[in-house]
């Protein structure tokens, strides 16, 4: 054991204080047996005390468990009553919603009748407007004839002004070319001086290099003379001859290069000087001809100015007549615009009323669906806790909610609890959503969000599908919008791509998630249809979603069908139910 008992400490002290006297083997064996028996008795006493304390603690824990189970039972009973109350309130709200929906449908029929009457009135006003537009076109034809005459006069004026501007531009160009020629002559003079300086510097450099080469030759010759001391006289003469021949060839090469460079400089200088002289002569002759043309242009401008004054008088008369016609046309346009704005305002008011009724209807439908889902979630949570606590289940009722034509199952597990299989069957006695889809190619339309947030496509084949030039068209009633894929986009085999609206709150993650920045929503309505066309304009897939609304004649008893809700133990305990503790003690 970890600690020694007081009896053991006392015996150890007595053994330490005993005199060291010799004992017989029998005495020693008896003492050892006696000591072992005492130790075993001490250990047994400690063990009995430990067992008693554990039994006491176990009884206290069992009492706590019993009390907590009683508290949990009371809380569960209260929570069940609270859920039943909320369920009854939700059912009453659902009934009120159904009645309100029927009223709204009746009002919608009235508004449709009023809308048809307004359409008839609008057609009559359209015929009146077409007559006014015919008169307007007649006035515009007369105005166009006058505009043509005025445009002819203005065109002649502009052509004369253009000729004058062309002559001025030619004079400016000639003066600019003359100044450029003078500048070129100065540049050529400077270039000549620069080339002469460069020739002088190159000559000096050549002289310097020649001196350096001679020094190097002398140095090389001295080195060879020192090396040729050990060589016989025949070999020495041969080396000197080769060295002299090599030096002679180097001198000839350098002289030839210097001569070529001098000849090139002289040829370049003479050619540029001749070009400058010819350019100066040409510029002088051009300036003289330009002066003659300028004199002729001045005389022509004077004659054209007199003609222009006459045309301006005629133009002023035409402008006065045009002003009168424009005033008459403005009055007619104001009257037509006023009538058209009145019709548009009436149509806008009718559209706003219809849109308000539709939005109210959609809000009521969303409230109903949310209530149904919440009721199912509460009931499923309650049944899960009853099953976990092994309580008798309450009588179930059935509530149906329609969100899509498909069904799905959700499985949740927690520790060693029993797995709960929840199946969502989506149908409604009052509102139902039906889907229909077809595809003739590798790509199909997998899903259309009923809230207008996204449309999802899927490549069902084992090959990549290029989507360049493909178009996806969404139709709701008479309105339609289209989305085109980029030329480089490719949908991988077995992959899905989701095209999100701009207000969906999703960030782009190509190639699986794309954002349509120009469209805030794909749109919602009772009849939504999406068509997918390839780059040749052929329809390869389509999917439609139709909302069917019926008014129930009488309310029947409904059975509960749980919607996919994950039953989590932590959420239940946050609402006030304590956790059960299961502890046991093992006595070794």
UniProtKB/Swiss-Prot annotation:
The scientific name of the source species is Mus musculus (Mouse)
Region (Disordered) residue spans: 1-34, 391-433
In-chain residues carrying the UniProt-annotated modification Phosphoserine: 17, 24, 29, 127, 159, 201, 233, 279, 303, 376, 394, 535
List, in alphabetical order, the GO biological process terms annotated in this UniProt record. Answer: nuclear envelope organization; positive regulation of G2/M transition of mitotic cell cycle; positive regulation of JNK cascade
Q: Show the segment(s) annotated as Coil 1B.
A: 83-216
Region of interest (Head), ranges: 2-35
Q: Which family does it belong to?
A: Belongs to the intermediate filament family.
Task: Locate the cross-link: Glycyl lysine isopeptide (Lys-Gly) (interchain with G-Cter in SUMO2).
Answer: 103, 124, 146, 158, 182, 242, 262, 272, 313, 331, 533, 548
Q: What is the recorded name of this protein?
A: Lamin-B1
The gene it comes from is Lmnb1
**Where on the chain is N6-acetyllysine found, per UniProt?**
112, 158, 272, 331, 484
